[in-house]
């Protein structure tokens, strides 16, 4: 899973707390009218974890596609087009992220480099429990907006 802006670029460590990641999101979008990002996942992620309200397999996800909560694409380019994200930016971001995930080190934002990150990871995944390539479609995206978590 990665989170990207409308240009298809990551802007922070997605394994941080909601508060810290929210701060990164606000800082990154400081000059923009609307603060939002896209959570991107592949088939493996959707089947094992889901995204937000869209729960993992075997829970059907058609409803979430119909109401616009989830956007789907058979390829990264399709997903970008269906969600309004820059296709070239998203392709480049996922290529870099996948290389880093296979190597087990997030060269951009250090995801998986702290005990807190590891606690929020999947210990069955190695070499870094916080990094897995986004490799197999269909790919899904959900719009993420700032909110109050209590």
For each feature predicted by the language model, list its residue ranges.
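An anion/pyrophosphate-binding glycine-rich loop and adjacent beta-alpha core
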Residues: 1-85
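A glycine-rich dinucleotide-binding beta-alpha-beta segment and adjacent secondary-structure elements
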Residues: 89-150
């Amino acid at each position: 899973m990665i989170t990207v802006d409308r240009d298809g670029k990551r802007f922070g460590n997605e394994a941080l707390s909601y508060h810290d990641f929210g701060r990164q999101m606000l800082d990154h979008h400081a000059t923009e009218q609307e603060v939002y990002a896209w959570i991107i996942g592949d088939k493996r992620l959707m089947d094992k974890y889901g995204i937000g309200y869209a729960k993992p397999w075997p829970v059907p996800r058609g409803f979430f596609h119909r109401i616009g909560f989830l956007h789907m694409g058979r390829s990264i380019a399709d997903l970008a087009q269906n969600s309004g994200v820059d296709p070239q930016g998203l392709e480049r971001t996922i290529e870099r992220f996948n290389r880093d995930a296979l190597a087990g080190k997030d060269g951009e934002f250090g995801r998986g480099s702290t005990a807190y990150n590891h606690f929020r990871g999947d210990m069955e995944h190695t070499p870094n429990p916080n990094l897995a390539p986004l490799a197999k479609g269909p790919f899904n995206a959900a719009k993420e907006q700032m909110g109050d978590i209590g």
